[in-house]
């Protein structure tokens, strides 16, 4: 049976991957939703107007929208279907994209309800990346005393564990005044 951590990472990967494939497709084509597609076109025009540096670099709203949409679709497919390290790389790129989108929303002065989904999915991407990259639990490994920390009798090879602070603390009720 898979560990809860593995189930969580797989569930987040598939859900986030499908979401970004869907959102990227909406940016690329009106076939899924004409209203959402036209709204994306309008939003990306305002992003390019608010950031003149993009125009100076030769990036128009169509190129920006299609580039971000294609990157979302590609990373979403990787998040959904490809195992291992590429999934974490796609997660990282999507996280950078979400941060860029949040920046654009702030730049044009959009209200929170227009970009709340980006905040939520940014948090989910961060959680997925942290869970996936967290080292395995090492509670089964034996704890060893740090080097140079000899026991009271001077034996460096003393492997007895020191009691934790919790075990040393007095147990029972405390009087607070």
Swiss-Prot record:
Localization of this protein: Peroxisome membrane; Cytoplasmic vesicle; Endoplasmic reticulum membrane
Alphabetized UniProt keyword annotations: Chaperone, Cytoplasmic vesicle, Endoplasmic reticulum, Membrane, Peroxisome, Transmembrane, Transmembrane helix
Transmembrane segments: 6-26, 62-82, 89-109, 115-132
GO cellular-component term (any): peroxisomal membrane
Lumenal side: 27-61, 110-114
Biological process annotations from GO: chaperone-mediated protein complex assembly; positive regulation of protein localization to cell surface
Residue span of region Interaction with NGFR: 43-54
Keyword Glycoprotein: no
Membrane topology recorded in Swiss-Prot or TrEMBL: Multi-pass membrane protein
GO terms assigned for molecular function: acetylcholine receptor regulator activity
Cytoplasmic side: 1-5, 83-88, 133-177
Similarity annotation: Belongs to the DoxX family.
Subunit text: May interact with NGFR. Interacts with RPN1, RPN2 and CANX.
Function text: Molecular chaperone which mediates the proper assembly and functional expression of the nicotinic acetylcholine receptors (nAChRs) throughout the brain. Essential for the proper folding, assembly, function and surface trafficking of alpha-7 (CHRNA7), alpha-4-beta-2, alpha-3-beta-2 and alpha-3-beta-4 receptors. Stably associates with ribophorin-1 (RPN1) and ribophorin-2 (RPN2) (components of the oligosaccharyl transferase (OST) complex) and with calnexin (CANX), both of which are critical for NACHO-mediated effects on CHRNA7 assembly and function.
Protein name per its UniProtKB record: Novel acetylcholine receptor chaperone
């Amino acid at each position: 049976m898979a560990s809860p951590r593995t189930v969580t990472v797989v569930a987040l990967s598939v859900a986030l991957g499908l979401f970004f494939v869907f959102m990227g497709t909406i940016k690329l084509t009106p076939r899924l939703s004409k209203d959402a597609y036209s709204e994306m076109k309008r939003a990306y025009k305002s992003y390019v107007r608010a950031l003149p540096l993009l125009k100076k670099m030769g990036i128009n709203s169509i190129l920006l929208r299609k580039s971000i949409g294609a990157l979302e679709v590609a990373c979403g497919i990787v998040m959904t279907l490809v195992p291992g390290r590429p999934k974490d790389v796609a997660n990282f790129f999507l996280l950078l994209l979400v941060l860029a989108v949040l920046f654009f929303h702030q730049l044009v002065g959009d209200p929170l309800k227009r970009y709340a989904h980006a905040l939520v999915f940014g948090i989910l991407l961060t959680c997925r990346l942290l869970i996936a990259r967290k080292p395995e639990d090492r509670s089964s490994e034996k704890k060893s005393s740090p080097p140079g920390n000899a026991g009271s009798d001077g034996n460096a090879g003393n492997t007895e564990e020191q009691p934790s602070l919790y075990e040393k603390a007095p147990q029972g009720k405390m009087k607070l005044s």
